[in-house]
Design a protein with these regions (language model features):
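NAD(P)-dependent Rossmann-like dehydrogenase/reductase catalytic/cofactor-binding core
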Residues: 45-136
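Internal alpha-helical scaffold of NAD(P)-dependent oxidoreductase catalytic cores
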Residues: 1-67
Length: 136
């Protein structure tokens, strides 16, 4: 059954927060979710990535809350150990991906809004040569 939501932008950004967070780290590490979660360093990087996305959303006036952030990480924790994101798989297979629409968007919006996004920028810049190669 369908249901109405109070703020569609919040729903869109909740989904974007989840996808962008796992896609970038997955594309960079090229390992499944279980290995990312089991590494304290990589999991912290994932949290930092998500926090930057959250900060950009807030700067854009999106009404995301800490509760939304918590629910995204609950979903990440509930992913199977072998799960990979579709963008990650595209990167690993040398196919064009949504890197520019995900982490690239956060980098551009962060600069436009004066929000620091160093982790997303690092992910984007590290994966950009592979993305350009896939699109050539």
């Amino acid at each position: 059954t369908a249901h109405l939501v109070k703020d569609i932008q919040v729903e869109i950004w909740k989904k974007f927060l989840f996808i962008c967070t796992i896609s970038g780290i997955g594309g960079l590490t090229r390992v499944p979710m279980g290995k990312i979660r089991s590494s304290a360093y990589l999991f912290k990087m994932m949290q930092d990535t998500a926090q930057e996305i959250f900060n950009v959303a807030k700067a854009k006036g999106i009404a995301l809350t800490e509760k939304h952030m918590k629910s995204v990480f609950e979903a990440i924790q509930n992913q199977g150990a072998e799960v990979t994101a579709s963008t990650q798989r595209d990167i690993m297979e040398g196919k064009p991906s949504e890197l520019n629409n995900f982490n690239g968007y956060i980098v551009r919006e962060g600069k436009r809004l004066g929000v620091s996004v160093p982790v997303n920028e690092m992910i984007f810049e590290c994966l950009l040569p592979t993305e350009k190669e896939a699109r050539s």
